[in-house]
């Protein structure tokens, strides 16, 4: 078995975050990642698409984190951006937005589902997430910047969603949510923090390796991929 490849699929660069793509990608590579997804919020996109630095050993994937409270408008944004990004995230935080995201198979990841006194998920939404293969994110940054009761509440919400994910076989993605270079943590540190949140070692490892790779494979199909509605004919069947 080869060495696992680690990915951080929620990183924000200027003008959304504090650092440039080059600065973030250089540090992420130094920390041991094989790739990151640039996922600026949709209301803080740069005027022009920055060049995404990539090599054979490290890649910056094009992504977006959609911010929209109206479910109908959210679906419109999903349709607008889906074909142009590798990673499409919805910023949750209300029951209506969470439901709209988890019921849409074109969404890759739901971030920040919690709201008020709710973890943001329930049995119905967890089933939708599993059926539509929408992953739930576990973001490290809020834990690093919180103390006292707020951190207790964050951990409680994470563990509640983790229980639902286990019960209904929902995919998890472990990300930094970095708004600056100071928010990035090495894969080993991230895995250790995930275990503090209640993830088993194999669950945390899958959330930072296997699930991100599956998202990219789904959105960047290889030459053998057959698009829906296209029939493959065997030799001699062309008449």
Swiss-Prot record:
The broad enzyme category this protein falls into is: hydrolase
Entry GO CC? cytoplasm; ribonuclease P complex
Catalysed reaction per UniProt? Endonucleolytic cleavage of RNA, removing 5'-extranucleotides from tRNA precursor
Quote the subcellular location field of this record. Cytoplasm
Cite the GO molecular-function annotations of the record.
ribonuclease P activity; RNA binding
Superkingdom, natural source: Archaea
What's the protein name? Ribonuclease P protein component 3
**Record organism:** Methanosarcina barkeri (strain Fusaro / DSM 804)
């Amino acid at each position: 078995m080869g060495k696992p490849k680690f990915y951080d699929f929620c990183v924000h660069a200027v003008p959304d975050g504090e650092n440039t793509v080059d600065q973030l990608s250089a540090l992420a590579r130094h920390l041991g990642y094989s790739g990151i997804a640039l996922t600026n919020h949709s209301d803080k996109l740069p005027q022009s698409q920055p060049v995404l630095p990539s090599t054979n050993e490290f890649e910056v994937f094009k992504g977006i984190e959609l911010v929209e409270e109206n479910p109908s408008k959210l679906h419109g944004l999903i349709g607008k951006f889906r074909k142009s990004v590798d990673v499409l995230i919805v910023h949750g935080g209300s029951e209506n937005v969470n439901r709209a995201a988890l019921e849409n198979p074109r969404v890759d990841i739901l971030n920040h589902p919690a709201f008020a006194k709710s973890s943001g998920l329930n049995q119905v939404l967890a089933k939708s997430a599993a059926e539509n293969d929408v992953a739930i994110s576990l973001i490290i940054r809020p834990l690093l910047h919180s103390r006292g009761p707020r951190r207790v509440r964050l951990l409680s919400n994470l563990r509640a969603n983790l229980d639902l994910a286990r019960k209904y076989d929902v995919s998890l993605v472990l990300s930094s949510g970095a708004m600056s270079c100071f928010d990035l943590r090495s894969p080993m540190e991230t895995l250790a923090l995930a275990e503090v949140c209640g993830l088993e070692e194999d669950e945390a490892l899958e959330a930072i390796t296997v699930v991100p790779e599956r998202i990219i494979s789904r959105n960047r199909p290889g030459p053998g991929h057959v698009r829906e509605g296209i029939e493959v004919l065997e030799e001699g069947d062309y008449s």
